[in-house]
């Protein structure tokens, strides 16, 4: 997988018009980023860390630094002695940097998104079943799925606990599906995920909106 340096991530944030300021980054501009992460417990050497969440604490970042973080991206500066990249929208930053880190895998997949108040899961699995039958007949890999029921990408297969995962995890699943030789992926897209930029850098080949009228559905 192609790796990028700090300068290239900063340029990306500039292009997205969300870069606010860089602090003490001059000497690390050419340093390669081996991992982008938003989980302080899942970092390694040469990690660019994305600070998100209103409840994030300074000690979480210090723990991450001890484990290999050398620069962080945040909406606010923390009391730590490493370079930082300040942005105006951390969720958008996580989304675009995640897509770049995984080398935009969604662009090489046929991605189908299913949104709507009711029927997202049912519609998603109908589509997966149809595509799986086609793939079987053509001697191709089955269809990846991201849903509120479970997630399957050819590498990971687990029961889901959320309808649409964080943007970083979406692009990780895309990368896994591509690595596994899959061509198609169908996913549920919640209204919340649209609101908080989780799918901001997902380019859907097909978008489906389910409409089921029920006067009590929002009560």
Model-derived features: where do they sit?
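N-terminal leader/targeting and accessory segments in enzymes
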Residues: 1-96, 100
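Phosphate-binding loop of NTP-binding sites
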Residues: 94-219
